[in-house]
């Protein structure tokens, strides 16, 4: 389907390093500084509209602080939002790493967690294991309890401008050896409505 094709294109060209990420200078600067200064938080909230690069940047951040693939866990909170799911995840945090300094837990759509899940997570955030980092990615920050927010460092992701989306479309069409005129690039960027993912449709 068209949806599958554009998702495949998005995944194929998903940034692998900070320098490949477009339009999130403030977010990247904060994260890069925390790595340089060795001031890494135990919990982060990455908030912003869909398709702005939250999960992508979370993965890059995990890699940049030296976590191996075996120590990076991604959970879709929309479909794993029960307290039992959270208990299993928290139990998992107690296990030692596979040789990395940190175990990273990326919770996508974190605002979808149930109240009891948030309560279970809160206890862990109050006394976090030394080698565990949580990254809560959300499009709905206001649905996350204030008690959770207060224990996380917040990183805001902004929707990319039309110009940045155009730049990304041109870069990818060049790599795909496809010629595309400027009017089409502009139209595609506008239809993307501030989302890198949607602008590759």
Identify what each model region corresponds to.
Residues 177:
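Extended polybasic, low-complexity segments that bind anionic RNA or targeting/receptor surfaces
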